[in-house]
């Protein structure tokens, strides 16, 4: 530190910035404060926006236009104000250019925070970019045809380069190489992207120091040799790198690599030694100083964390000379993973256990991909047919990556889903890891002390690791979470003996509900396997997410058993999902009236369909009226899950509940309100029998059915039940331990 004054200063500045960010929040970070658009307008309000285009993307149904320097006019309150950045979605094929000023008439919409634990936080993602709202445009007019020639030319060149790669290599491999070379992931095959991520090689899709080394250091060294001048080489490399960075965009990893490149070249030009820790600290100060929200960004933490591992931990591993060959090969990769594990688990909830070995193949071949990709593209742009052959090398390597990823997922324990650790566990982990680094760095190298060093380090690391991952393992009691999945139903039950259950899972207004809402929630809770998935009936808003989960078991969550109502209540959709479950290795079980499923003190009992005393069940058809009804008991806690039951089905259920209440003197703490709060369900007679303390309603915001219905809400209020709705609360959860229970937001 005494020989690195700039490093010391940067660390102090980082500590100050971090403290201000954590304590000051919106007082210190302007991006967290409401923007004029949020203050002056409301959701779906009509406005007229006039702004300058700084970026645009072509979508299947129109264009996505990024505007800056915006003037916004609210039509309803006749108010005009300024907004720094806005995104416009419009179904128009009109040719636009960067720098054009356009006027758009449309409706305002705001980004949402994550509605469930583990879900993508769209609002925070755009806040980091200084964007607080979007406009769905109906009319558009170009008011100024001025063009930012420099950025427009780069955008056209980038788009043309991407088209060339896709044309020459095909959509799958071409899309991957476009992501690697250009940072363009919007049209990349989602399955390919996910395959890389779950295998621990998603980092190759991020523009990093390796890319800038080829673009910048390659040119720098070439021109330095040609001219014999460090300054000329540095200037040429810097100019080429500036063009490349301007084309791909200044992401946080690009910013880090750009600053470190300047330090590298600057050290050569001035005849000084390049110091990676100092360059890294300066890059961190610039990044956090320009946008403090990077401190909460997974990309920032992974990018800088990987370089921090290279500076601190990996040198300690390499300096031990008397090591087995396998340790020397795998040691650096394992050491880096040890540094990054808390970040990986916090943002992705799982660790690919074979990633170290896979990266031994992937990383050495990356220079080949970059050099052949850039060279082949340039030759092909110049009209040379040899460019196609050069690009074929990249295609073969990417197919090798693909095959290895698919193969490794078939290996036992390929992925370890540990869940999202609490922040305090991450802090303790890093404090103990720092202790290990100090032990290795400063303990004397006498043989006896070396053995003590190994033992102390191992004991300390095992303790740190157990603290990091033990959250889900130490969970006590039972927890029930009603997920917000829009217009649909999905409830997760985590039992006292660590078995996991899902009751329904589907939505009629949210696409890919299994992949983007249910699965991330399960993984964030450390749920790698669902022991039982109950399907109440065959409506798609209760089952399409379950179908996704069944198909995604290789990269998602395993499902042991699918539980369906008795055969007499099956329809075509239930038959279809049963066939699908068997095809993907999931057992199928029927649950008839009176069937019980126990886990310790917790018990599920099926109360329908088919439980009436007058044998009316023969008149009940498939569908809502024959929904599976479940009674959950845990100690003195009782909860009723009613699916979409209504009409005759609810009448029969009321008769059953009357008998149970008289025999067992049961009161239900929570009722999962049937059919999303439809007026045809949850009658006064039914509520007089159940008399719940709390009523949970799962319904989509602004749904076309008007759920929950006002009459249903009035009946619930009249019964004395306190209402929790996913529309208002997002995910809702209840935790039960012994004789205590508390309801809280699912994100808490």
Protein language model regions, located:
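Start-transfer (signal-anchor) and selected internal transmembrane alpha helices
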Residues: 1-21
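Hydrophobic alpha-helical transmembrane segments in multi-pass membrane proteins
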Residues: 9, 189-356, 372, 419-475, ...
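Membrane-interface helix/helix-cap signal primarily in integral membrane proteins
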Residues: 15, 21-203, 515-520, 529, ...
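Non-globular, low-confidence helical/coil segments that flank catalytic cores
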Residues: 73-74, 92-107, 124-126, 131, ...
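Aromatic-rich juxtamembrane segments at the membrane interface
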Residues: 128-260, 265, 338, 532, ...
